[in-house]
């Protein structure tokens, strides 16, 4: 996790040992699936590229993910997922919802509207929030909705941060309707002369994430205190990255936006207070305007 997700690595240290083990095993499976689809190792180029097509690799992931529900697995990532799924009663549908997000990449899905982008965010991150919440003992739908909201917010932030990197890899998760409003297309959005217009799209995406971050905060009381602290820390770190993207404007993609170690520590301290006060604060009902996960 230190290599694959530095933003979440700090937060993960705050879980109790049992929860952290399960979280890391779930992460290992998610990371493995991502790497297999992209033919990478921990997000980096593979020295021995696969001879299979992306479609074939996706089919193998689906087959191997289905097997843990029935037989003993020996491949590390799938053995880890098997242990987590059985220990925490993770719904098989969640695992396949996650794989559906990779299928969207494989099939080069186009995203016309914000709703389309949010559907992608659900598959690659929102459903991971659901599985994480189940690891932490959550079973009620209201808290699961908030966990999904946090995943959506995380992915919206990731998309804003990685717009140019994704475009260079031939991927675009921005709503085409938003791009059209700025006179951009998926083919020219990463051109240096378009950075000012692109920064406005990124700002809009970060602003879209805000109500999902707020909604997620209302789910913290439904978690054990240490888990609430860990999740609040991750929430604050990712939100800070989105703020940096906005603050950097057209320069946001000159370097990868991230938080420094001192910033992470400050956010960790702030999150401890957030986790505690969330238990006595009044939380508004979840807004009907937010994207609703499939149930």
Curated annotation (Swiss-Prot):
Recorded coiled-coil stretches: none
Protein keywords: Carotenoid biosynthesis, Manganese, Metal-binding, Transferase
Cofactor note: ATP is required for the transferase activity but it does not seem to be hydrolyzed during the reaction.
PANTHER family: BIFUNCTIONAL LYCOPENE CYCLASE/PHYTOENE SYNTHASE
Entry's Gene Ontology molecular function annotations: geranylgeranyl diphosphate synthase activity; metal ion binding; squalene synthase [NAD(P)H] activity; transferase activity, transferring alkyl or aryl (other than methyl) groups
Taxonomy, superkingdom: Bacteria
Cofactor dependence: ATP; Mn(2+)
EC number per UniProt: 2.5.1.32
Biological function: Involved in the biosynthesis of carotenoids. Catalyzes stereoselectively the condensation of two molecules of geranylgeranyl diphosphate (GGPP) to give prephytoene diphosphate (PPPP) and the subsequent rearrangement of the cyclopropylcarbinyl intermediate to yield 15-cis-phytoene.
Organism this protein belongs to: Enterobacter agglomerans (Erwinia herbicola)
Protein name, as recorded: 15-cis-phytoene synthase
pH-activity dependence text: Optimum pH is 8.2.
GO biological process: carotenoid biosynthetic process
Description of activity control: Significant inhibition is seen at GGPP concentrations above 100 uM.
Keyword Metal-binding: yes
Known pathway: Carotenoid biosynthesis; phytoene biosynthesis
